Amino acid sequence: MKLRIFAFFMAVILCFGCISLFGCDNGKTDETTAEETTASAETTGEETTEAETDAPEIPDEGYDGSAVTIVFYHTMGQNLRNVLEAYIAEFNKLYPNITIEHSQVGGYDDVRNQISTEITVGNQPNIAYCYPDHVATYNISKAVYPLDALIANMAEVTRADGTTERMGLTQKQINDFIPGYYNEGKQFGDGKMYTLPLSKSTEVLYYNATFFAEHGLTPPTTWDEMEELCRRIKEIDPDCIPLGYDSESNWFITMCEQLGTPYTSATGEHFLFNTAENRSFVKRFRGWYENGYVTTQELYGAYTSGLFVAGAGEQKSYMSIGSSAGATHQRPTKENGAYPFEVGITTIPQVDSSNAKVISQGPSLCIFDKANKQEVYASWLFMKFLTTTVEFHAEFSMASGYVPVLKSVATNDIYAEWLSGADGGDGIAALSAKVCLDQVDAYYTSPAFNGSSVARDQVGLLIQDCLTATADDVDAMILQKFEAAVEKCKYLS
């Protein structure tokens, strides 16, 4: 009941905040020195009718050279801020009257929470890192500016060096985005585009390539192959847990996507995951857990990469499914100047390997509406500069471990040279990036709506509960837990 009262209170505040949105000064935050943190749950989105805005369409006019200050919230650590600042300097050569003030605001959840508070007094930034469910939350008060008219804007803008550029995106620029990443920005149910992708990650399967070679094992391409492989590995090393899977939530959501079964919907009834097919795959994975084939981050009590890189004499795993951006954490510590084993990386197992589906994660950028439309224009020009500059994406990817969102980055000379050093040792981050670039057609997103993050949390807990619960009637237990999870989603949303 307290949660319901709190949710109602926040909704009222956000609605009243919308009234004062256009009459207040821009929010500004001093830059911090905190290291980049990662979100506890990376969510992705498709659509929501609850995210509609009625922001006016921008006509074909452009930035007029006005002196404006643009506030940008992100989660970058110092190494990424160094890259950002170098490209802000390049941007200011073209637009010297646009001042960019950027601030590291903790992790992704911290960015969301701070902006949600600032929206209530019209003090939100101009640009921010975002996930789709963040946008759905901000748009309760219609705070995010739709990008469609900006993207289509044909006005020519004169830069400080005398050259001109189109305000909007060219078709060539649009085509250069990896489609799965670009389309995430317009899957909110109202047909509007709210975000552009900045940097992305996904899940990949890390495996002990040395162990696999010694025992004639082949990385699995399907979950059926994974089950048989776990059985064989368990025979070779009875004390091991063959597979670690970091994110229970991702596992559940990805299985729904691969199976083509319901998870959530942005319209109508939101929480659709209580189906016989979904209960069946959870029951199957319960059997894996009981056989000692698999563990997860919450069940293990830490990231499962700890099992994967464990040394001699420790319980270990030989496979780990985790973030592509965390490749260096899946590499063992050198012993006497050499790695104890080589790491292989491949696409996660599929229900149907000919129709692969892997989750899309990582931050996008959104623009917040302002009374002074020159701030909107300037924000757009900076967002466009960051998201379409190949050199920026190459440097940002190499510094962060995240995957570039532009196809052409792969042919950038510096980035191509970095990729050429991909291996299962010192070049493991490049190896992870290569796998991600090779599966660009497989990325999917899930519906984003006010409550989608609750669903994500609940299905993660559902996996944990169903794998570990004691029950004489397993089917009845799983059904009861699915029903309870759906009700919890409704209660908390």
Please report, for each region that a protein language model flagged, where it lies by residue.
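Short, well-ordered beta-strand elements
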Residues: 66-77, 98-103, 127, 243
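Extracytoplasmic "Venus flytrap"/periplasmic binding protein-like
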Residues: 90-176, 210, 214-218, 309-311, ...
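Mature extracytoplasmic/periplasmic domains
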Residues: 64, 83, 152, 325-334, ...
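Glycine-centered hinge/linker elements that transmit conformational signals in sensory
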Residues: 229-232, 269-299, 348
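C-terminal capping/gating helix-and-loop segments adjacent to ligand/active sites or protein-protein/ligand interfaces
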Residues: 359, 423-487
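Extracytoplasmic/periplasmic substrate-recognition and gating elements
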Residues: 93, 99-101, 121, 191-192, ...
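Hinge/lid segment of periplasmic solute-binding proteins
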Residues: 55-62, 133-202, 342-349
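Short, polar/charged alpha-helical segment
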Residues: 59, 77-99
